[in-house]
Swiss-Prot record:
Gene Ontology cellular-component annotations: cytoplasm
HAMAP family in the record: 16SrRNA_methyltr_H
Stated family: Belongs to the methyltransferase superfamily. RsmH family.
Broad enzyme group: transferase
Tagged with keyword Iron: no
Subcellular location(s) per record: Cytoplasm
Gene for this chain: rsmH
Organism of origin: Anaplasma phagocytophilum (strain HZ)
Taxonomic lineage of the native organism: Bacteria, Pseudomonadati, Pseudomonadota, Alphaproteobacteria, Rickettsiales
Protein name listed in UniProt: Ribosomal RNA small subunit methyltransferase H
Residue segments, region Disordered: 275-295
EC number: 2.1.1.199
Function: Specifically methylates the N4 position of cytidine in position 1402 (C1402) of 16S rRNA.
Length: 295
């Protein structure tokens, strides 16, 4: 997977429709794919935000290509208003979100996000390690009930209790589950691979743990609320999500904002084409929604 290949890029740009002289926030900068697309589309400014310090390396490349037009602030997007103060702006013409884990995070085994390569049980998006909980906290400390609930609710894993019992049994016999390979092996031992669904049996549980570690759903709620407060009239909020729970939060928030002077840009979520899915499997579950402030 390529960290420079953002999902639904053209569709996002179509909804955002960047204008010369405008100011946009890329709330999930990552590898800079969305920011690059916006900067190439119009002579505008992008305020880039990301909680992962690694993103600053991609920012340097973009900054040299678009001097004075892109600026970076290390922050969670739930702190959008604080970030805007740092940039000395009160409002913007649009905010874009590409939520969830990035390809560059997945591809680095030292981050612990992937079950494909051995790595530490980490999964913290904030590499400064200001978060107190990690994947190790989850597998080695949570109660059976809490663990099963997280795996079922955040991962949609029907066999959540079976997975939980296997994790609890392993940690009781071995004292600790040491790395992502250990964890993936435990999950695969109790979740059969489906012929109808090609995804790895560990996918849903790893996803659930990542969402729990980073408090992703509450972050998204806070980020959307902050975005609604910083866009001016005509300003847009565009969100690409990858999980049904994320999309539900976006849909619910956008519907609520219709009572506050916002209007949906697209009534139904935009999904990737078969061509994009074949070229970038990460896009398979993506959904894109947009809303504009009309008054």
């Amino acid at each position: 997977m390529d960290s420079h290949r953002p999902v639904l890029l053209n569709e996002m740009l179509e909804l955002l429709s960047p204008k010369d002289g405008a100011v946009y926030v890329d709330a999930t900068f990552g590898g800079g794919g969305y920011s690059r697309g916006i900067l190439e589309r119009a002579k505008c400014t992008v305020l880039a935000i990301d909680q992962d310090p690694i993103a600053s390396e991609f920012y340097q490349s973009l900054h040299s290509q678009f001097p004075g037009r892109v600026h970076f602030f290390l922050s969670k997007f739930s702190r959008l208003r604080e970030a805007l103060q740092h940039f000395d702006h009160n409002q913007v013409d649009g905010v874009v979100f590409d939520v969830g884990v990035s390809s560059m995070q997945l591809s680095d085994p030292d981050r612990g996000f992937s079950f494909m390569k051995e790595g530490p049980l980490d999964m913290r998006m904030d590499m400064l390690r200001s978060q107190s909980k990690s994947a190790a906290t989850f597998v080695n400390s949570l109660s059976e009930k809490d663990m099963a609930d997280v795996i079922f609710y955040y991962g949609g894993e029907r066999l959540s209790r079976r997975v939980t019992r296997a994790i609890i049994s392993a940690r009781e016999s071995n004292n600790k589950i040491r790395n992502t390979s250990d964890l993936a092996k435990i999950i695969r031992s109790v979740v059969p691979r489906s012929k109808a669904n090609p995804i790895d049996p560990a996918t849903r549980t790893f996803q659930a743990i990542r969402i729990w570690v980073n408090d992703e759903l509450e972050e998204l709620k806070a980020g959307l609320e902050a975005a609604s407060q910083i866009v001016g009239v005509g300003g847009k909020i565009i969100v690409t999500s990858f999980h049904s729970l994320e999309d539900r939060i976006v849909k619910h928030k956008f519907n609520a904002l219709r009572e506050k002077g916002f209007q949906l840009i697209n009534k139904k979520a935009i999904k990737p084409t078969e061509k994009e899915i074949s070229e970038n499997t990460r896009s398979r579950s993506a959904k894109l929604r947009g809303i504009v402030k009309e008054e």
